[in-house]
């Protein structure tokens, strides 16, 4: 669309960056302490668990990008992939902080749920950052949309840095405190990610004529 993007549409889109900022911040801030202090996981093992999704992202994100372009070419929208991520991420995030196990079993639980959360995050984030180019064909308007996204991302990071530790403390620390925090953050993720995912139904996609296949995507 070439018309200027309205304030309501800008806010609806940028709201997703509060969710992405929160998810990008909280695991790095609290997950290591949750595993070592509340679950009894050795620090070295906990460090490996926290690092694991970064390696997975390098393989999975290009796959999501290729799938998003194929979806856009087939349906004219990226909505289904965005919705999949918006719905799956809150569930996986809450599950990270609900381990029924301790020690090595807890490390495995957190590793699996963290990878699932990272995968769900990619399902939302990869098509989400492609939307500004499809919301307007004017470079200055795309820049404006991106600026809004960055501002809301900053808000999300700041909110996460203050809210998550405060909720853990108010809920009594320990496993219960982290479980309550996970549920609160999951609710925040659900709201902030669903709004732009549903709003993307009104944004016609503009994928390339020939989206990359899986092998080509992994080479990029």
Model region roles, listed by residue range:
Residues 1-220:
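Membrane-embedded alpha-helical bundles of multi-pass transporters/translocases
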